[in-house]
């Protein structure tokens, strides 16, 4: 299978390199278009006020296009202009840090997959539930083996399959669960700090309170040690509320 690979952690990130190697070893052809720099939590941002520049990375058996832009830029430019062949599947990841619940709105990883889906491609987002993953080569091999089992024929158009791996050894994973995303939200705060030169700055912190996470949702099952699989479609219409606002019509 021909696969286009991207991420939001950057083209040199360990997660991308791990899944690249695993997909190649599984017999797939992999074309990489990924950001040159760290782009975590940029959401679905698109560069419109400056040109996009591209750097080719070719080292130790790895080859890919590095884009000085966002993950969405990578997909828009890569799938329309850079890649000579259309992929059968787009994979975004493996991200350092889970993308569950409200993370999905902020995630450059999920946004890259979403952009690919909007362009008519089958797309998967892969994430690992640790911001400092060590060796995830075994998880990458597991993901490479899991991807061919997705039954795309039964899924609607522009659907993204969001897959998250727990931060446990592969042999300790309890299984795979298809589940909804949690509706719990981040409780954020900013730490006010002073730099060595006396300047003031702020640093974001946050937590999703465990008691707000409903059982059977992606965050809950991931914490329990399951691989979570959540199909996503980005229609933000609140259908239940449409009729309540009908009085606004003239």
Swiss-Prot record:
Catalytic activity, EC: 3.1.3.5
Presence of the UniProt keyword Transmembrane in the record: no
Keywords, comma-separated and alphabetical: Cytoplasm, Hydrolase, Metal-binding, Nucleotide-binding
Primary localization: cytoplasm
Domain of life: Bacteria
Reaction equation(s) it catalyzes: a ribonucleoside 5'-phosphate + H2O = a ribonucleoside + phosphate
Pfam families to which the protein is assigned, alphabetical: SurE
Cofactor: a divalent metal cation
Transmembrane segments: none
One annotated Gene Ontology cellular component of this protein: cytoplasm
Annotated residues for binding of a divalent metal cation: 8-9, 40, 95
Cofactor annotation comment: Binds 1 divalent metal cation per subunit.
Name under which the protein is recorded: 5'-nucleotidase SurE
Organism: Nitratidesulfovibrio vulgaris (strain ATCC 29579 / DSM 644 / CCUG 34227 / NCIMB 8303 / VKM B-1760 / Hildenborough)
Gene name in the database record: surE
